Regions:
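Vicinal oxygen chelate
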Residues: 13-16, 64-108
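Short, charged/polar surface micro-motifs in flexible loops or helix N-caps
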Residues: 44-48, 55-57, 70-72
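N-terminal beta-strand motif that seeds the catalytic metal site of vicinal oxygen chelate
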Residues: 1-19, 62-64, 112-134
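Short acidic/glycine-enriched loop/turn segments that link adjacent beta-strands
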Residues: 34-37, 58, 93-97
Length: 137
């Protein structure tokens, strides 16, 4: 059974700029840095990795979604650091507050916070799923 995601690794064509970008948003460097070919940032119990890529190697589109303590505070931090999110934070119909930001290599990042109702719903679904497994035993 899959238990979770340990890490996401993104390619970068300009490593120093990419490392500065993530540091400015508050990511903690665990290994590597601007001059390393591989850098790992801690994201609580998971990791975001950057790996240097040759210019001719292009990546396809993708999105990484990070849950954060305060969506609006991180949005303000991004603006203060000189970055320009696509739009201001908003409340989504699926129960999250979020905003998107494109990193220096074109990767789309989403910074979100689930609402209590969504968190409660997921906990209830997990409990019900566990109970149904007990009934089958």
């Amino acid at each position: 059974m899959i238990e979770g995601i340990s890490a996401v690794t993104l390619g970068t064509h300009e490593k120093p700029r990419a490392v500065r970008f993530y540091r400015a948003l508050g990511f903690e460097v665990l290994h590597g840095g601007e001059e390393s070919s591989f850098t790992s940032f801690r994201a609580r119990t998971s990791y975001l990795n950057l790996i240097a890529q040759p210019v001719e190697r292009r990546s396809s589109w993708g999105r990484v979604i990070f849950y954060v303590a305060d969506v609006d505070a991180l949005y303000d931090r991004a603006l203060t650091a000189g970055y320009h999110p696509a739009a201001a934070p908003r409340d989504a119909e699926w129960g999250e507050r979020f905003f998107h930001l494109i990193d220096p290599d074109g990767h789309e990042l989403s910074f979100a916070r689930p609402s209590l109702s969504v968190s409660a719903r997921y906990q209830l679904e997990a409990t019900c799923h566990s109970m149904s497994r007990w009934e089958r035993v």
